[in-house]
């Protein structure tokens, strides 16, 4: 099966920017990791993960690029990458650069991958944004880091890739209290109640954060939980009694 990925038409239209939100197809892994598992922290053999990551890079024609990733920790920590940067997996959840040939990557399996690009300044970014990073301000941290190397807020476009959506994202009462206390603005519109159960709308919350950061936001509308044939999902695997799960990769690079 071929490597497949989703794209934003807005990001695709920006010169010199290549990007992809990858599905789980086209890799070499098997079982619950079938098949393009790109998570080195999983129990999948590392050789499989390395091959899968290489296939993702190659699918975008970025074989000559250097791949950067993170030890994702649900934070607002963002790193600025240049030619002197090491490709060690530093703890954090965001990467930005203005250098060519630096492929920035994040992993997801329900948490949102968000890819950023300034339409004229040649600045890009990639963020991993679960609910903790979202309410703590990962979007604004990304925007500030991009602007520090030449981007302008009015020219930044952010695209939310495959992530868990509201109908699949049941949360507990204590989550609602944390959401309200950490957000600093009214959050009722992002919660839906049905039969004494609460459901959180992570993509809409991220779009609101984009709006508050004065950048353009877009959601591809891809539910990782629901689209079982296309994406890995931590929550879906948990509900199926599985203790492990694969991770899909999202990439962006200046060429």
Name each region found by the language model.
Residues 1-255:
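Active-site microenvironment for binding and transforming phosphate-containing groups
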């Amino acid at each position: 099966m071929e490597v497949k990925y989703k794209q934003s038409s807005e990001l695709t239209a920006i010169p010199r920017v290549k990007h992809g939100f990858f599905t789980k197809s086209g890799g070499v892994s098997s079982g619950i990791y079938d098949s393009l598992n790109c998570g080195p922290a999983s129990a999948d053999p590392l050789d499989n993960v390395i091959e899968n990551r290489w296939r993702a890079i190659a699918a975008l024609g970025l074989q000559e690029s250097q791949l950067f990733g993170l030890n994702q920790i649900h934070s607002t920590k963002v790193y600025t990458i240049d030619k002197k940067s090491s490709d060690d997996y530093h703890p954090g959840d965001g990467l930005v650069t203005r250098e060519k040939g630096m492929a920035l990557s994040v992993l997801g399996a329900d948490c949102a991958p968000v890819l950023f690009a300034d339409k004229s300044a040649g600045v890009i970014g990639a963020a991993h944004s679960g609910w903790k990073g979202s309410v703590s301000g990962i979007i604004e941290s990304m925007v500030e880091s991009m602007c520090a190397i030449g981007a302008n807020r009015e020219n930044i476009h952010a695209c939310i890739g495959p992530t868990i959506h509201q109908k699949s994202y049941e949360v507990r009462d204590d989550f609602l209290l944390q959401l309200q206390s950490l957000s600093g603005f009214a959050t009722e519109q992002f919660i839906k109640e049905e039969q004494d159960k609460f459901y959180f709308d992570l993509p809409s919350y991220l779009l609101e954060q984009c709006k508050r950061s004065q950048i353009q936001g877009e959601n591809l509308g891809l539910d990782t939980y629901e689209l079982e044939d296309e994406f890995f999902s931590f929550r879906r695997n948990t509900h199926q009694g599985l203790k492990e799960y694969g991770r899909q990769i999202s990439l962006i690079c200046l060429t």
